[in-house]
Each structure stands twice: as C-alpha cells, then as structure tokens.
Amino acid sequence: MKVIFLKDVKGKGKKGEVKNVADGYAQNFLFKQGLAIEATPANLKALEAQKNKQKKEAEEELARAKQLKEKIDTLTVTLFAKAGEGGRLFGSITSKQIAEALQQQHDIKIDKRKIELDDAIRALGYTNVPIKLHPEVTATLKVHVQEQK
C-alpha cells in the first residue's frame, strides 16, 4: 500500500515521502498513530501543493534576507563605552549590545544569536561584524565604538 508520511518514521521514511509499505503495517500502525495517510490522488495533489507553498515561502524568505543584507551593509552602529589608556575598553561590547543598538538606532530587530561575534569587542574604533540572516546570506555591520566621556 502506498502511503504519504506525515512525520519521520525511523527506518521507514521521512516526512513528505511517498513509499510502499505492507497493508497491515499501514492500517494497524501508521494510520492509527497519525504517522501517515493513504496516497490517494487527492492526498498526493495536496502534498504537491504543500511542497510548492513551502518552496515559495523559502524563496520569499531568502529574498527578504538579501534585501535586509543590502540595507545592513550600508549601516554603521555607534556604541559608547568607558576606555582606559591605549583604547582598551573596561569590559567589552557583546552581541546583545550590538543587537540593541541596531534596534534603537536603525529600527532593525535582529536576534543576538545571529550576530557572529567570535570574541567580544574590547577596543575602540571600527569593527566589521558578520550577521547571519539566512543560511545562505551573511551581512556585515560596521560597529563604531567610541569612548564615553
């Protein structure tokens, strides 16, 4: 019997796959557990429509990420921090502070976990900070750290 998997089933199939399984296994386990549905022409059509919708949403998300990247690449965020001699900061600038400053100064909300800061910024001046907006899109934000007077 052909079935469409609604969830991943270990050793049998992944979500969205159409596979042939034993009739008893399908009726007594997969259908009752809500793990699969019968692969009727109507269900196959619905599956195809769902896949197309997901693909379209993914493309739109990628387009939005590219658009945001172009905007972020032109921006500079200015932060103020107390510094000692030689431009060394007392403390450091973290990804959380960068995300908050981006929100306040440019009204762009970015999750701090998307800011790929290897180490916190510990010196005055300009630093280029990569921001992963999408698995395929990474923007670069210029962060300017100035001494707080």
From Swiss-Prot:
The keyword Transmembrane helix does not apply. InterPro entries: Ribosomal_bL9, Ribosomal_bL9/RNase_H1_N, Ribosomal_bL9_bac/chp, Ribosomal_bL9_C, Ribosomal_bL9_C_sf, Ribosomal_bL9_N, Ribosomal_bL9_N_sf. The keyword RNA-binding applies. Keywords: Ribonucleoprotein, Ribosomal protein, RNA-binding, rRNA-binding. One of its GO terms (molecular function) is rRNA binding. Pfam families: Ribosomal_L9_C, Ribosomal_L9_N. One of its GO terms (cellular component) is ribosome. PROSITE patterns: RIBOSOMAL_L9. SUPFAM superfamilies: L9 N-domain-like, Ribosomal protein L9 C-domain. One of its GO terms (biological process) is translation. Binds to the 23S rRNA. HAMAP family: Ribosomal_bL9 (MF_00503). Belongs to the bacterial ribosomal protein bL9 family. PANTHER family: 50S RIBOSOMAL PROTEIN L9. This is Large ribosomal subunit protein bL9.
